[in-house]
């Protein structure tokens, strides 16, 4: 838990405020801040740099001269990257610079960055009523009273942005005004001083303070989550299409499923309970057995002539045996 001073519009110290946020462990704090900074700075890139290749440059469809016989180097197009006004090799192309980060990690990095600036944090009382009419000179003098020198930068965090405060601050280049819902890691770490109003601090403590309930996602978090979900849906779904095709084939193969065993048993029981059905089954079984017996008899008759040798061969065999005996 850390404490910071509370100052009024005249620059007088009127009290102190405590700030206790759930932050990352010391051994991982620098890495989580690095990830959040890299994500924020990368997502800020537009990625509009784009060059044309030799296929996109206008012209160059005709071969400048014939392949052989001129004594000159071979050339197939006047828009070759080697030629003047030709295409560009490996130039920048339009692309999306998007890095995703879990919502809880983003919130942890934000709390860690804010808690790390406690020594440079100044709580000021709400001064919206003092800007009537809004004057840049009044805010510049108040910054000096609060301890922000002319060569130092500051981040002013308010609960809700008002037209009076914006008009009074927008012409001071070294001061950046943001609402509590616009809090980000880069702005917290990129200034010399962090100024926050008392109303913004109370909302911040109610949202992220120790003992507070789990923070609900802000509108920016919801928009980013929706963008990430849309990006995931836009990615190629070849694997999903292959799986769906396999599922369709399996569904077609199983279009005519076999009857369950319970249903088959039930059908057999119904057939046995009907005498006519039972007699028909017995007759079919007897006919099948008769056909099987007849087929076996026919096969036996066909095999008998093949097993007996011819009569002439029997006589020759007998004569040969008698000669051997003599």
UniProtKB/Swiss-Prot annotation:
Q: Which Gene3D superfamilies match?
A: 3.40.1370.10
Q: Which residues form a coiled coil?
A: none
Output compositional bias ranges, type Acidic residues: 313-326
What the entry lists under InterPro entries is as follows:
Ribosomal_uL4, Ribosomal_uL4-like, Ribosomal_uL4_dom_sf
Q: Which UniProt keywords apply?
A: Ribonucleoprotein, Ribosomal protein, RNA-binding, rRNA-binding
Instruction: Specify residue ranges for compositional bias: Basic residues.
Output: 60-71
- Give the region (Unknown) as residue ranges: 212-326
- The record's region (Large ribosomal subunit protein uL4) falls at 1-211
* Composition skew (Low complexity), residue ranges: 252-279, 294-312
Q: Name one GO molecular function term.
A: structural constituent of ribosome
Asked if the Swiss-Prot or TrEMBL record annotates the protein with the keyword Ribonucleoprotein, the reply is yes
Please give the biological process terms from Gene Ontology that the record holds. translation
What is an example of a Pfam family matching this protein? Ribosomal_L4
Q: What is its biological role?
A: One of the primary rRNA binding proteins, this protein initially binds near the 5'-end of the 23S rRNA. It is important during the early stages of 50S assembly. It makes multiple contacts with different domains of the 23S rRNA in the assembled 50S subunit and ribosome. Forms part of the polypeptide exit tunnel.
Homology family: Belongs to the universal ribosomal protein uL4 family.
The identity of this protein, by name, is: Large ribosomal subunit protein uL4
Organism listed in the record: Synechococcus sp. (strain JA-3-3Ab) (Cyanobacteria bacterium Yellowstone A-Prime)
